[in-house]
């Protein structure tokens, strides 16, 4: 069932691919056609596009990028799954189809830097796409937030007081696979 969703709709949930970009329609996010001189592609991923809980992360991060004046675009309905799940489930043919499709699209629109909030997409884009002949600077959203915070992009915002619990989940794909442990902690300090 999941493979059929990937093959026909480019997502494991089997949701209509023409709704992939619905989350950003009211936010004024541009596509590469509208902003061909973008600096960053915000690659949202399947969960960030379709899962209602994860969309909250996508929307909040988008608003931070906009507040900081970052020149970015999203692919919206044209985004295809990065291929991570198909590859992990053993469907290498389907994964390579998705990877090659994305690489062609990235090349066509001139992608050089990719930001993503999804740890699975981050690991795949950063460590597996270069095996297919093309690599990019891939940045996890916590790295971008840390950098923008250091530059003072969010002055006037609320700061964590240090009182009470602050919970952060160290994703396997960020921590163990990419050694990104301190980045989110730096943001909270």
Question: Positions of the model-derived regions?
Answer:
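Iron-sulfur-cluster electron-transfer modules
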Residues: 1-117, 122-129, 133, 148
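Short, structured patches in soluble enzyme cores that scaffold and shape functional sites
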Residues: 44, 140-142, 170
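Conserved active-site and cofactor/substrate-binding residues in soluble primary-metabolism enzymes
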Residues: 56, 97, 139, 143, ...
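Short, catalytically relevant binding-site loops at active-site mouths
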Residues: 121-123, 144-147, 172-176
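Redox cofactor-anchoring modules in respiratory/redox and cofactor-processing assemblies
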Residues: 150-189
